[in-house]
């Protein structure tokens, strides 16, 4: 490819509304252009990288035995109504009516459609296992699309769905997809972690996220440097930081804390460690009658140490909270505690509440907590002596850096990550809802055991840039760069020798299967270099009259601090050996 044939449209500055590095650089590099909130044109430079990501995914999915198909972007409501998700999906699913007043939606995902395929086409256990995948446009009407392609409304996704005759066989399909995803992200050249993830309302214990490591990532990834343990912050188990409860050594005292309503302020006022305080969080659950009217509300008091944070996902797994909870209203808090938030605690309640203590809180002694009176806290509080034991002790907090690893092999560390892939064991959730069955070996109908496996194709571009960039621009891994090599001839229109050597190098690289672009725009060297550093091409070769007189060209890798001189005769073998080892 020659630059004059291609479409190069770089910007010196990013638009003012660009928020994150990847969004700014993709716009400046001429990869994307915004059409509407969360919707982008992918220009030729960006599409080249997308196609390379898709090709790697396609090769590894095929290698794993998955079969490619395409399902419609526009899907009828009837299938979604079978699973109940037509109403549950909320406004994120864009719905519309056709000219016949029939309801349709733009697909945010395709479990219903693929399950319909299976129930129509897979009649016998002899046809199993099967794994279908597509690389297709999705649309989710995000409330606040942001961060460019990282959280767009229209995006490209690879979604795969496995169908098996047993849970054991489904586990094998899951493992095969996990291995395929690992190969995909290895080939993409990204630093990533596969972490255990929460399974949400579906249940089960098979779910992993593939997270690209980046300081700007939205997700917290917990791992142990001394073992293979890794989980996202929602799932990572928090052990008690106190092996056992010490005996009481201080009397209970109602202590004035005027205007100090946070654990940090109370600890500073009293001159005690923040880890000696207890934080109170009040939740409520509602019982409804058949008409949906609330007939009873139950108030819950959850206690975590003052330097810890409540993990709402873990709280949602507690019996009684599984069906859903909310934070209590101020009226409910006044009714049960007799005071406003900021001074709440488990001692001297106005009305009974269910008390759940985090594992660490349950082992605390002589702790500080709210006194259920404005401007007062208790000091020297102890379980059993000053207040009843909690109704339940559970892991309800987020882990923090330095916590003991649940596998007992060291301490936990935390990184930031960007989720780009997810593998999930579904079980029979969809096959039962849609009565999708096959005839098993005994001749009886049986529901398919399913798994689903997603990769955000366009999101990978943003994640790769967030991980790989500098002040000059993008630093693409070679496997997904729009071009692997750029040849920059200095004096293209003026020197026949430069044109000849540039063309010879170009021809040699093309013959070796290298994706190379020859910059024949006749720009000044500084302009060419700035463009290609911004775009992020991994390898640059500069050919000029001065170097040719000495028989050398200038080579610079995108990550190299300085250029090096390489003999003209050696430059093609040098590049080919690096790119096609």
Swiss-Prot record:
Main localization category: cytoplasm
EC number: 6.1.1.15
GO terms of molecular function: aminoacyl-tRNA deacylase activity; ATP binding; proline-tRNA ligase activity
Entry GO terms, CC: cytosol
Keywords: Aminoacyl-tRNA synthetase, ATP-binding, Cytoplasm, Ligase, Nucleotide-binding, Protein biosynthesis
InterPro entries: aa-tRNA-synt_IIb, aa-tRNA-synth_II, aa-tRNA-synth_II/BPL/LPL, Anticodon-bd, Anticodon-bd_dom_sf, Pro-tRNA-ligase_IIa, Pro-tRNA-synth_IIa_bac-type, Pro-tRNA-Synthase_IIa_type1
CDD domains: ProRS-INS (cd04334), ProRS_anticodon_short (cd00861), ProRS_core_prok (cd00779)
Reactions catalysed, as given in the entry: tRNA(Pro) + L-proline + ATP = L-prolyl-tRNA(Pro) + AMP + diphosphate
Pfam families: HGTP_anticodon, tRNA-synt_2b, tRNA_edit
Protein localization: Cytoplasm
BP GO terms, sorted: prolyl-tRNA aminoacylation
Family annotation (NCBIfam families): PRK09194.1, proS_fam_II
PANTHER family: MITOCHONDRIAL RIBOSOME PROTEIN L39/PROLYL-TRNA LIGASE FAMILY MEMBER (PTHR42753), PROLINE--TRNA LIGASE (PTHR42753:SF2)
Binding partners and assembly: Homodimer.
Free-text function comment from the UniProt entry: Catalyzes the attachment of proline to tRNA(Pro) in a two-step reaction: proline is first activated by ATP to form Pro-AMP and then transferred to the acceptor end of tRNA(Pro). As ProRS can inadvertently accommodate and process non-cognate amino acids such as alanine and cysteine, to avoid such errors it has two additional distinct editing activities against alanine. One activity is designated as 'pretransfer' editing and involves the tRNA(Pro)-independent hydrolysis of activated Ala-AMP.
Recorded domain comment: Consists of three domains: the N-terminal catalytic domain, the editing domain and the C-terminal anticodon-binding domain.
Family under the similarity heading: Belongs to the class-II aminoacyl-tRNA synthetase family. ProS type 1 subfamily.
Protein name: Proline--tRNA ligase
Gene from which this protein is expressed: proS
């Amino acid at each position: 490819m020659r630059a004059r044939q291609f479409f190069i449209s770089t910007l010196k500055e990013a638009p003012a509304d660009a928020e994150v590095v990847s969004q700014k650089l993709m716009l400046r590099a001429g990869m994307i252009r915004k059409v509407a909130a969360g919707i982008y044109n992918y220009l030729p430079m960006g599409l080249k990288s997308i196609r390379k990501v898709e090709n790697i995914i396609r090769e590894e999915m095929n290698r794993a035995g998955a079969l490619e198909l395409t399902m419609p972007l526009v899907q009828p409501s009837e299938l979604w109504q079978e699973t109940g998700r037509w109403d549950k999906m909320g406004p994120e699913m864009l719905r519309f009516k056709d000219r016949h007043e029939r309801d349709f939606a733009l697909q945010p995902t395709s479990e219903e459609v693929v399950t319909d395929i299976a129930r129509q086409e897979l009649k016998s256990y002899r046809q199993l296992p099967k794994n279908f995948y597509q690389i297709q446009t999705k649309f989710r009407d995000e409330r606040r699309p942001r961060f460019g392609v990282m959280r767009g409304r229209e995006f490209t996704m690879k979604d795969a769905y496995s169908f098996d005759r047993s849970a054991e066989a489904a586990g094998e399909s899951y493992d095969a997809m996990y291995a395929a995803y690992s190969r995909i992200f290895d080939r993409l050249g990204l630093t990533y972690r596969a972490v255990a993830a929460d399974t949400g309302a579906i249940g089960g214990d098979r779910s992993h996220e593939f997270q690209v490591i980046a300081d700007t990532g939205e997700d917290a990834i917990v791992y142990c440097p001394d073992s293979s343990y890794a989980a996202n912050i929602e799932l990572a188990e928090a052990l008690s930081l106190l092996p056992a409860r010490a005996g009481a050594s201080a009397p209970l005292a109602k202590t004035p804390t005027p205007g100090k309503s946070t654990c940090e302020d109370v600890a500073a006022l009293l001159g005690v460690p923040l880890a000696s305080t207890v934080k109170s969080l009040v939740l409520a659950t509602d019982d409804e009658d058949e008409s949906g009217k609330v007939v009873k509300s139950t108030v819950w008091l959850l206690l975590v140490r003052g330097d810890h944070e409540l993990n709402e996902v873990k709280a949602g797994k507690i019996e009684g909270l599984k069906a859903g909870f909310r934070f209590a209203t101020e009226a409910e808090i006044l009714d049960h505690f007799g005071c406003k938030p900021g001074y709440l605690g488990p001692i001297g309640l106005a009305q009974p509440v269910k008390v759940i203590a985090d594992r660490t809180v349950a082992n605390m002694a002589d702790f500080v907590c709210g006194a259920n009176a404005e401007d007062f806290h208790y000091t020297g509080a102890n379980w059993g002596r000053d207040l009843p034991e909690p109704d339940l002790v559970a892991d309800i907090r987020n882990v923090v850096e330095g916590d003991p690893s649940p596998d007992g092999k060291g301490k936990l560390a935390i990184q930031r990550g960007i989720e780009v892939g997810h593998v999930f064991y579904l079980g029979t959730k969809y096959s039962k809802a849609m009565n999708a069955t096959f005839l098993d070996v005994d001749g009886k109908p049986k529901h398919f055991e399913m798994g689903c496996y997603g990769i955000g194709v366009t999101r990978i571009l943003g994640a790769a840039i967030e991980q790989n960039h500098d002040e000059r621009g993008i630093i693409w891994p070679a496997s997904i760069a729009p071009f692997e090599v750029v040849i920059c001839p200095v004096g293209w229109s003026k020197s026949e020798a430069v044109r000849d050597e540039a063309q010879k190098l170009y021809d040699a690289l093309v013959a070796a299967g290298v994706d190379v672009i020859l910059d024949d725009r006749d720009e000044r060297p500084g302009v060419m270099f700035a463009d290609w550093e911004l775009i992020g091409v991994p390898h640059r070769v500069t050919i000029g009259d001065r170097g040719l007189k000495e028989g050398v060209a200038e080579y610079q890798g995108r990550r190299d601090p300085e250029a090096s001189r390489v003999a003209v005769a050696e430059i093609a073998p040098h590049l080919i050996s690096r790119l096609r080892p």
